[in-house]
A protein has these predicted regions:
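N-terminal catalytic cores of peptidoglycan-degrading enzymes
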Residues: 2-124, 129, 232-233
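Short strand-loop junctions, especially beta-strand C-caps/beta-turns
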Residues: 79, 138-140
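Basic/polar, cationic surfaces and motifs that engage anionic cell-wall
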Residues: 2-9, 37-54, 141-234
Length: 234
């Protein structure tokens, strides 16, 4: 649940933690590694029907997970931005934050922005960054209409696949909200995120090779007041 006192934008908060991450021992990925938006990441990270839209190399740290760091958790986020604007932020070298995946509200379309082997700067806690996969969900924490059936189901499929890949238990100890990260000042995914529904889906679904139509990443956001609310933050 969002605190009663105002906070800065979640992106500005993440940025501060990301600067600390940049000083870690891992070597930042060079600019030449940034792939074109339609290419999939190397190393087998991509799941079927996930669109590769890379974050700027300035916004994450190159690594060799799980050899270098075990992957033990999935962290659920809410963007407080539109899908389109979130991707633009991740591709901005000055932003200093990223997540591995972003799920679109209207249709559950998934963009992968950082390879799973690399450390996305999403949790605001370096230890949690190194040991987790971050999934952003388009929406605002005070408006549950953004948490659509398709968003829940596609995200749950992705989380289930990640858990299966790394042997992560499908429970609330290992699938957590950003708010649960130690030292976090964030409140996402918020009180309207249906954890019972989400965990049930994670345990029931499997990644399906659906013949989905790849949609343009710069499609308009779902109908509503997204542009009017673009300045709102938790």
């Amino acid at each position: 649940m969002a605190p009663s006192h105002p906070h800065p934008a979640r992106r500005s908060l993440i940025t501060g933690a990301a600067v600390l991450a940049a000083s870690a021992a891992l070597t930042p990925l060079t600019a030449s590694a940034a792939a074109a938006p339609q290419r999939r990441p190397r190393g087998g990270d991509a799941y079927p029907h996930v669109q590769w839209i890379p974050a700027s190399p300035s916004n994450y740290t190159a690594a060799n997970r799980p050899k270098q760091h075990p992957i033990e958790k999935v962290v659920v986020h809410v963007t407080q931005e539109t899908y389109r604007d979130t991707l633009r932020l991740f591709r901005n070298p000055a932003h200093r934050a990223s997540a591995h995946y972003v799920v679109r509200s209207a249709d559950g379309h998934i963009a992968q922005c950082v390879r799973e082997r690399d450390v996305a700067w999403h949790a605001g806690n370096w230890g949690y960054n190194t040991r987790s996969i971050g999934i952003e969900h388009e929406g605002w924490i005070d408006d549950p209409t953004w948490f659509t059936k398709r968003l829940y189901r596609r995200s749950a499929r992705l989380t289930a696949a990640i858990c299966d890949r790394y042997g992560i238990p499908k429970d609330r100890e290992h699938i957590i909200g950003h708010v649960e990260v130690p030292g976090s000042t964030h409140t996402d995914p918020g009180e309207f995120w249906d954890w019972a529904r989400y965990l049930q889906l994670v345990r029931e679904v499997s990644w399906q090779f659906e013949m989905d139509t790849e949609l343009d990443v710069f499609d308009a956001p779902p109908a509503g007041s997204a542009r009017e609310r673009a300045g709102r933050r938790r």
